[in-house]
């Protein structure tokens, strides 16, 4: 006697408005993988074209005008104007810190004492947009590039010895592991010597 075997059927539950089990994808109300920028709850996330969550990026180019800083858990924060300018320039420097330093050193020197009391954000934006500036601008542009690249960078405004007195000056310090390295773009551009001790 012939026996008939019923075909086994399995049903897969479609995921909607939720994360995949591995936390790498998010499905919308139609069960499709989300791509692009998506706000989920209180946080913003960025998903690649294949739907995978982008994670752990000091800066991530979403389009020509928008960059994000993305944490290890995928939470994204849109970069400010100056951070975006720094990210664009750093990419043009081949994502290379030494080339970024050389770019800041090569800015055409223009002293501007009227803005000497501004902050690193102002100086950097000035330098990225105008391609010139004084020691404050040279240091600030490099500082912003190092920062968006993920380095523990500090912009320092102080004084250096000049003649029998001292002169206002700015430079950058980067802490790597337990050591602090000094980077002085203006020193290199003015004296033609290596203006850093971090390489």
Label each region the model flagged.
Residues 140-199:
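Hydrophobic/aromatic-rich core segments of domains that either
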Residues 100, 131-146:
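Active-site nucleophilic cysteine motif
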Residues 54, 60, 112, 119-123, ...:
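General structural signal for secondary-structure boundaries
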Residues 80-127:
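Secondary-structure boundary elements
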Residues 1-87, 91, 163-173, 177, ...:
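Extracellular adhesion/carbohydrate-binding repeat motifs centered on closely spaced tryptophans
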